[in-house]
C-alpha cells in the first residue's frame, strides 16, 4: 500500500491517468498525496476534481494558489484573472459548488511521521520551524473550512505584508500565511517574500535566494515535498527537499514521488517548455 506524492496537475487529466497507470495505482489500497494546483491552465480541471473527489482511499491534498483562485471565484466574488484561466467548466458545472466546498476543506500542510514527510504547495517559510508551520497551517485551514470563508476569499489577494511577524493579526496575518504556503519561490536573506521574480535560478537577482537556500532558514526535521515551481524542473539543492512540479503543462512531465523510498516516476505532459 504505497503512498505517492503527485506534482502540480493543473487540469491535466490525461497525463494524470497515464501516470497512475505507470505506477500501477490501486485505488482501493494506495494513497495519493497531491501537492496542489489541481486545477487551471490545463484543459480538464473539472474531470481532475471529480476523479480525485471520487477516490475510495481519501487522498491527502495541500491547496495551491490556483486552487485558492478557483475558490475565490466560487465564493469570494473574485473577477476572472484573464485569458489563461480555464475554470469556466467548473464554475458552470452542476456540482461545481459541491466540489468547491470539498476543496476548501483540504489542507495547507500534510505530514507523516512514519514516512518522515511534510508536504505543502510552495514550501515552508524560512522563518518557521515545523511546529510553527503546522500551527499556522491549522490556523488558516480553520478559516477556509469555517463560516467566514466568504470574507477571506473576497480579500485574500495581495503581496503585502511580505514578511512574517508574530505581531500580525487579522487579514494581514492570513494573507502572509497564504502567500508563504502557496505562492513563495524566492526570498531575501531575511526571509522576506519576493513575489515578482519567477524565473530560473541562473538569472535570479543577486539579493534573492530560493526559499530553501535562505541563509537564516530554520531546519525542518522531516523531508519536505513541494510543487509550484515548474522552472526548477524537479531539482533542488538539498537532498531532503523534493521538488515535484516538473512542468506538466509547459513541455515537461507529470511526476509522482513514492514516499516509502523516494523513487520518482514521470510521464510526458503537454506543450512546449518555457524554461530552456
From Swiss-Prot:
The keyword Lipoprotein does not apply. GO terms for molecular function: bis(5'-nucleosyl)-tetraphosphatase (symmetrical) activity. It holds the Pfam family Metallophos. InterPro entries: ApaH, Calcineurin-like_PHP_ApaH, Metallo-depent_PP-like. The keyword Hydrolase applies. Hydrolyzes diadenosine 5',5'''-P1,P4-tetraphosphate to yield ADP. Belongs to the Ap4A hydrolase family. HAMAP family: ApaH. This is Bis(5'-nucleosyl)-tetraphosphatase, symmetrical. The gene is apaH.
Amino acid at each position: 500500500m504505497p503512498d505517492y506524492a503527485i506534482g502540480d496537475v493543473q487540469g491535466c487529466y490525461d497525463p494524470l491517468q497515464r501516470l497512475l497507470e505507470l505506477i500501477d495505482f490501486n485505488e482501493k489500497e494506495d494513497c495519493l498525496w497531491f501537492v496542489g494546483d489541481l486545477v487551471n491552465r490545463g484543459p480538464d480541471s473539472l474531470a481532475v476534481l471529480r476523479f480525485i473527489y471520487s477516490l475510495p482511499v481519501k487522498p491527502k491534498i495541500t491547496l495551491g494558489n490556483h486552487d485558492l483562485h478557483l475558490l475565490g471565484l466560487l465564493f469570494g466574488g473574485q473577477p476572472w484573472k484573464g485569458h489563461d484561466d480555464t475554470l469556466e467548466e467548473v464554475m458552470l458545472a452542476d456540482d461545481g459548488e459541491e466540489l468547491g466546498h470539498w476543496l476548501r476543506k483540504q489542507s495547507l500542510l500534510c505530514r507523516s511521521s512514519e514516512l518522515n514527510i511534510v508536504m505543502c504547495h510552495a514550501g515552508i517559510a524560512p522563518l518557521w520551524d515545523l511546529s510553527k508551520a503546522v500551527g499556522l497551517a491549522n490556523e488558516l485551514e480553520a478559516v477556509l473550512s469555517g463560516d467566514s470563508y466568504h470574507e477571506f476569499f473576497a480579500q485574500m489577494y495581495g503581496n503585502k505584508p511580505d514578511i512574517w511577524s508574530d505581531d500580525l493579526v487579522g487579514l494581514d496575518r492570513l494573507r502572509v500565511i497564504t502567500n508563504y504556503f502557496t505562492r513563495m519561490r524566492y526570498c531575501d536573506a531575511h526571509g522576506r517574500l519576493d513575489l515578482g521574480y519567477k524565473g530560473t535560478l541562473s538569472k535570479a537577482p543577486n539579493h534573492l535566494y530560493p526559499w530553501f537556500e535562505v541563509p537564516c532558514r530554520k531546519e525542518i526535521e522531516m523531508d519536505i515535498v513541494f510543487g509550484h515551481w515548474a522552472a526548477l524542473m524537479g531539482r533542488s539543492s538539498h537532498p531532503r527537499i523534493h521538488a515535484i512540479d516538473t512542468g506538466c503543462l509547459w513541455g515537461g512531465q507529470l511526476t509522482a514521488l513514492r514516499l516509502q523510498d523516494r523513487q520518482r516516476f514521470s510521464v510526458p505532459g503537454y506543450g512546449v517548455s518555457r524554461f530552456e
